[in-house]
Amino acid sequence: MNINFFEKTRVIDGGMGQELLARGMEPNGTLWSANALLNDKYHKLLLDTHIDFIKAGAEVIVTTTFTTRKTRLKDNGVEDKFEYLNKKAGEISQQAKSHFPNVLIAGGLPPQFLTYEADPRSEEEI
């Protein structure tokens, strides 16, 4: 990486999990964007979303690995997919970068335990 990279503000991509849901990905437990890695039918959607973030001005895209930690995968019954999901996230990010060689890829490194808990209440209950 060029040492001058940090001399100006850089734009990172947007909220991938929410964007994938907005584009039609069906939720799967608490996997969020990792569901797009787990389910082959969402791989193109994930790639296209990375590309759209780049076209919107992102100079850095983040791998969809925020929910691919072992504890989250175990909670969702797919702990055996740990290596596959993390490799697939890198592969799809690399595919997006291949169209835009100046874009950088950052790995999404989550905390190893819960960062938040979903609120199961309906809008009416809230």
Residue ranges and their predicted role:
Residues M1-I126:
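Domain-level signal for soluble alpha/beta catalytic cores
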